[in-house]
UniProtKB/Swiss-Prot annotation:
Extracellular side: 21-302
Other noteworthy facts: During protein synthesis and maturation, CD1 family members bind endogenous lipids that are replaced by lipid or glycolipid antigens when the proteins are internalized and pass through endosomes or lysosomes, before trafficking back to the cell surface. Interaction with saposin C is required for the loading of bacterial lipid antigens onto CD1B in the lysosome.
Motif (Internalization signal): 329-332
Gene Ontology CC, one term: external side of plasma membrane
Protein name: T-cell surface glycoprotein CD1b-2
GO molecular function term, any single one: endogenous lipid antigen binding
Domain Ig-like: 185-295
Membrane topology, record value: Single-pass type I membrane protein
Alphabetical UniProt keywords: Adaptive immunity, Cell membrane, Disulfide bond, Endosome, Glycoprotein, Immunity, Immunoglobulin domain, Lysosome, Membrane, Signal, Transmembrane, Transmembrane helix
Cytoplasmic compartment segments: 324-333
Protein role: Antigen-presenting protein that binds self and non-self lipid and glycolipid antigens and presents them to T-cell receptors on natural killer T-cells.
Species of provenance: Ovis aries
Quaternary structure and partners: Heterodimer with B2M (beta-2-microglobulin). Interacts with saposin C.
Length: 333
């Protein structure tokens, strides 16, 4: 564990260059969703995530892990991965059995869903923080951190009973503590290094403007679309000159299939006030060259004309050359 701070510096500051700040994910979490339909049917779903990027899946029928990226194993050996997969398989089977045996004790009513999330997160200049959280139907029940189990404030007796139950299974508690405090930080540093070519890439966004559904008489909904960017942090602002416009509404940043992101930012304005507005996009891949799109700017019409005229001109030149060569060949004959 004493080597972790040095490894952390190697991941965040590759090559020891303070200017080369890590731009990719900083956390890894395993997510478990266990659905209990009745006393005889239950199902486990599992996945592994670097921030919002999924790199693992879980095949519940066969009890095997699915590695979604070539580097998803990090720097763990095949033997270590096999040991961990076997451990999770046994845990998930035992988890369902244990919960079904204690439905009455914890006053649970079918159907219900239990969620568990465990993982660790890098904090620049600080230690790696690890934790495990459990929830019932979306409401927190307990949290395990710093070698202690803490009931959630609104969990009532359930959180206290679960923490008391875990304290009776010292072997299980020790395994959880080792996975969260030791295995997870080591895996996180290894997978960030193994996948750094993809995780630290910079992909420039594409941006375009459109109008949305009419919000009311005499009103316009201006929409600024930004897509295909990576990493996730981005700033999109509707502006008039250098003044940010109030009333800007930003949607959720949504994932694309290629691990890039999409964002939609809208502004509701009076139809007569749309002229002179612009959408500014700031992203790390752009440096200080922000994308600025002007609503109804003449440049947009000019670009459309260029897009039509240039291909037509090229086609005309090609046809002229073809007729000239054919005419020359006939004259020779």
């Amino acid at each position: 564990m004493l080597l972790l701070p040095l490894l952390l510096l190697g991941v965040i500051l590759p090559g020891g260059d303070n200017e080369d700040v890590f731009q990719g994910p900083t956390s890894f979490h395993l997510k478990q969703i266990s659905t209990f339909v009745n006393s005889t049917w239950a199902q486990n779903l599992g996945s592994g995530w670097l921030d919002d990027l999924q790199i693992h899946g879980w095949e519940s029928d066969s009890g095997t892990a699915i590695f979604l990226k070539p580097w998803s194993k990090g720097n763990f050996s095949d033997e270590e991965i096999t040991e961990l997969v076997d451990l999770f398989r046994v845990y998930l089977i035992g988890f369902i059995r244990e919960v079904q045996d204690r439905v009455n004790e914890f006053q649970l009513e079918y159907p219900f869903v239990i969620q568990v999330i465990e993982g660790c997160e890098l904090h620049s200049g600080e230690a790696i923080e690890s934790s495990l959280r459990g929830a019932l139907g979306g409401l927190d029940v307990l949290r395990i951190q710093n070698h202690s189990c803490m009931p959630a404030p609104d969990s009532g007796n359930r959180g206290q009973k679960l923490c008391a139950l875990l304290s009776q299974y010292q072997g299980t508690s020790d395994i959880i503590e080792r996975l969260v405090s030791e295995t997870c930080p080591r895996y996180l540093l290894g997978v960030l290094d193994a996948g750094k070519a993809e995780l630290q890439r910079q992909v420039k966004p594409e941006a375009w403007l459109s109008s949305g559904p009419t919000p009311g008489p005499g009103r316009l909904l201006l929409v600024c679309h930004v897509s295909g960017f990576y990493p996730k942090p981005v700033q999109v602002i509707w502006m008039r000159g250098k003044q940010e416009q109030p009333g800007t509404q930003q949607g959720d940043i949504m994932p694309n299939a290629d691990w890039t992101w999409y964002l939609r930012v809208t502004l509701n304005v009076a139809a007569g006030e749309a002229a002179g507005l612009s959408c500014r996009v700031k992203h790390s891949s752009l440096g200080d060259q922000d994308i600025i799109l002007y609503w109804g700017h003449p440049t947009s019409i000019g670009l459309i004309l260029v897009a039509i005229i240039v291909p037509s001109l090229i086609l005309s030149i090609c046809l002229a050359l073809w007729f000239w060569r054919r005419w020359s060949y006939q004259n020779i004959l």
